[in-house]
């Protein structure tokens, strides 16, 4: 029997942008308990950002050494409106991936007339861009509409990729015209700090994980062996 724990709060600290009130207060104790029984995977939410990370007890631990994996699922209400798909296969392996809610296909199939639904991806991007443009307008008033739009598009693109757990091309973003406008017009703003935090936190993709059967079985065998060695001689003999 394999146990798959699921919780709201996070097991591991997985964001440079959100550094407080995300991981459990007693996460160290929970990690120790779950790893005692060689649990391979932990699922959580709360952060609203798609993340995957393996716990390492200390720096320098080998990449193939056991450590519980945590998948944080992003909020389906935030573009690109993803949800997670976890397949627990007959061979014992676990495969995780993400899918986006295809609102446009549903809208066409059900003959909806709302153009926002028919082009849901485009509407979602425009919605985020407008939201950021309004925030820019609230803190700076001496930039033209084209500059504001360029800044908003840059922020929105990073925002969507960040929450979706995608790898972000840091160099590409920071050499873009939109980012240049951010540095020039709002160098000390919290929005630029957030933009940089999202870029720095997105150096890899977080949308796929495969835990092969042999990995899971090895971890379970190691736990059973350790449990047997901790038991008394008579108990170990019965096992």
Per-region residue spans from a language model:
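His/acidic metal-ligating clusters that form di-metal
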Residues: 1-69
């Amino acid at each position: 029997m394999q146990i798959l724990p699921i919780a709201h709060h996070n097991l591991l600290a997985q964001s440079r942008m959100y550094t407080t009130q995300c991981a459990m207060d007693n996460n160290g104790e929970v990690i120790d308990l779950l790893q005692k029984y060689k649990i391979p995977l932990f699922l959580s939410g709360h952060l609203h950002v798609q993340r995957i990370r393996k716990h390492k007890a200390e720096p320098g631990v080998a990449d193939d050494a056991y450590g519980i994996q945590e998948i944080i699922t992003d909020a389906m209400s935030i573009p690109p409106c993803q949800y997670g798909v976890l397949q627990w296969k007959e061979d014992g392996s676990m495969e995780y991936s993400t899918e986006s809610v295809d609102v446009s296909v549903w809208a066409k199939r059900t003959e909806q007339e709302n153009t926002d639904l028919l082009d849901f991806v485009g509407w979602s991007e425009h919605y985020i861009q407008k939201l950021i443009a309004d925030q820019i307008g609230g803190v700076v008033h001496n930039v033209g509409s084209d500059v504001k739009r360029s800044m908003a598009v840059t922020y929105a693109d990073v925002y969507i990729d960040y929450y979706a757990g995608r790898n972000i091309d840091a160099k590409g973003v920071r050499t873009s015209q939109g980012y240049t406008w951010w540095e020039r017009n709002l160098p000390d703003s919290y929005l630029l700090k957030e933009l940089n935090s999202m870029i720095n936190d997105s150096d890899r993709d977080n949308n796929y994980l495969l835990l092969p059967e042999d990995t899971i079985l090895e971890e379970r065998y190691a736990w059973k062996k350790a449990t047997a060695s901790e038991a008394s001689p008579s108990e170990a003999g019965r096992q």
